[in-house]
Amino acid sequence: MSQLDTWEWFGNRTFHYSQFEPLAALREARERSATTVSVCLPARNEAATIGQIVRVLRRSLLERSRLVDEIVVVDGGSSDGTVAIAQSEGAVVHCEGDVLPEEGPGSGKGEGLWKSLHVCHGDLICWIDADIRNIHPRFVYGLLGPLFTDPGIVYVKAFYERPIRERNALRATGGGRVTELLARPVLN
């Protein structure tokens, strides 16, 4: 593939959340597809952010626009109140150790992602991080949009230009490197 073909491929397969606003058309596309959607947040000790994330997504995407059907938190053994906060904001919460206990314990975020497949009820699962400090519903509908508007798309991976902490400094950009350097080229 030439460099020009590569850039054309990226251009044709890169979406911006604003392409799916207003949400009414996206909701109609979802309803026509009869597809159910779960938003899942694997979490461990995210009390500082989980409440705001669940509240914003519940109000906007579950109650107002009805774009998603459930918000699920899969907790990896939090000791800081994450579970209680997520439940109080309306999320369905499952503890990793209670899901497929016969498989034994795993470790890290991967366990939460894997076990969420067994507790989420949606035909689609939209995973988002539980430590997002600037949450906005567009983080979810920007991922769902391509799936509901282009039948040839079966997988969507977000990338963000966001600040990243390196050593003791905060760089203005730098997030999204794994997606840009590995995921997108491999999935091509």
Q: What positions do the PLM features span?
A:
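N-proximal low-complexity "stem/linker" segments adjacent to membrane-targeting elements
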Residues: 1-59
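Acidic helix N-cap motif at the loop->helix transition within catalytic regions
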Residues: 48-51, 80-88
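Well-ordered alpha-helical segments embedded in enzymatic catalytic cores
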Residues: 52-56, 111-115, 142
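A conserved acidic beta->alpha catalytic loop
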Residues: 66, 75-83
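Active-site-proximal specificity loops/subdomain of glycosyltransferases
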Residues: 88-118
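Acceptor/aglycone-binding surface of glycosyltransferases and processive sugar-polymer synthases
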Residues: 101-109, 135-188
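Short aromatic/hydrophobic "clamp" motif used to bind/position activated sugar donors
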Residues: 125
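The conserved acidic donor/metal-binding loop of glycosyltransferases
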Residues: 129-135
